[in-house]
Amino acid sequence: MEEIQRYLQPDSSQQHNFLYPLIFQEYIYALAHDHGLNINRSILLENPGYNNQFSLLIVKRLITRMYQQNHFLISTNDSNKNTFLGCNKSLYSQMISEGFAFIVEIPFSLRLISSLSSFEGKKILKSHNLRSIHSTFPFLEDNFSHLNYVLDILIPYPVHLEILVQTLRYWVKDASSLHLLRFFLHEYWNLNSLITSKKPGYSFSKKNKRFFFFLYNSYVYECESTFVFLRNQSSHLRPTSFGALLERIYFYGKIERLVEVFAKDLQVTLWLFKDPFMHYVRYQGKSILASKGTFLLINKWKFYLVNFWQCHFSLCFHTGRIHINQLSNHSRDFMGYLSSVRLNPSMVRSQMLENSFIINNAIKKFDTLVPIIPLIGSLAKENFCTVLGHPISKPVWSDLSDSDIIDRFGRICRNLFHYYSGSSKKKTLYRIKYILRLSCARTLARKHKSTVRTFLKRSGSELLEEFLTSEEQVLSLTFPRASSSLWGVYRSRIWYLDIFCINDLANYQ
């Protein structure tokens, strides 16, 4: 790590901006093999589905071949000879692209560490569990009672190879690396395997996921620079504890660097976004923008985003990918949570001299609920219960040992409780727990060819109850409310950091 920092660290004499020579250094591939860089396995260096099965011997031979070859020998006429540098094209191209992604991540990682160090909460560097999904926690904790409209945005997907290259041209200075990037994209480009838009998220090819994830994250990072305009005149964009999460810190770091440039070049458009009181969050290819503004203002934002993305990225972006919903009339379905703003009526009796008055007040309250009907539908699809919520046995698990069966049911139960720990109402979770517990008992009774009552009487009902309620030592976050002293004691919701992705049962769409 120190050697890389010395190479990239600018000095008074010269500044090293060229990443291309690092491709020919063998220690780079060794670092990529064990996810090195000694920065606590940062999220930028760990991607789900990343294939870390590197062979250092193959890398050594590959580097030797790269030194010996004058140019890439690619056969386009004979499709049967799938060769790359005279050898297996798929294997070597994957090795080089993975190494390339690792190298280009280095300046991003160093910049991220420096931005994290500028905040007071430096303890974040000691956590191994932070993921981009955790940036949604403070969004769900924000005060939405004063907001009116919500924009549901599906981030546009790149339709041209050069768009992906241009997103990196500000960060990668040497043309050789950009040409190598173009080479990889032309090799792997396939609309069905690289990036597709059939779902709100994006799917990547099974191979080279690290390479494609890095390109996509860089592209989305560039798309989010659009919100510089929307935030410029607002003092309410930054959410509760905004300095506590990686993605938010990086997002605001980019805003601070670009706000002066954009404000100077495009002063005409800034008047549209005077004090918008907005909140923003993104996960995967879906983002949400909530604001206090009127419908006319939100509609202007919608067409502004469409026009900006069309002009800046040279793509055809349809207005149907952005939907405007009124927050008080629609429930938000985001990441398996059912969020809504409901009116909480309260009656206050006031007495003035001999007359008394009864005043009815309706206070808006933002709730994050557990969607019981879709969740039961997901359990029924996995054969844990019927569509009406009646628990049934799991026949495919009957061949497992008793401890494995209990462990699987207990893991599902704990994962759901951790995933929905931030829900404002947890009564639904206890119904889910009842379904899983009884389904586990029926599966065990089916295995031992007895009834549920007989099995529980013989083994003891405390066995299931004790296991399903056991907790593990998991890092968690809480966001205390600043107004808790005014409204009494606020019961902080707990957000667990062992959540890496949307729960499969919660992802019922």
Curated annotation (Swiss-Prot):
Biological process annotations from GO: mRNA processing; RNA splicing; tRNA processing
Compartment(s) where it occurs, according to its Swiss-Prot or TrEMBL record: Plastid, Chloroplast
Keywords: Chloroplast, mRNA processing, Plastid, RNA-binding, tRNA processing
Top-rank lineage group of the source organism: Eukaryota
Example of a GO MF term: RNA binding
Pfam families associated with the record: Intron_maturas2, MatK_N
One CC-aspect GO term: chloroplast
Keyword Ribonucleoprotein: no
Signal peptide interval: none
UniProt record similarity statement: Belongs to the intron maturase 2 family. MatK subfamily.
Role summary: Usually encoded in the trnK tRNA gene intron. Probably assists in splicing its own and other chloroplast group II introns.
Protein name: Maturase K
Species classification: Eukaryota, Viridiplantae, Streptophyta, Embryophyta, Tracheophyta
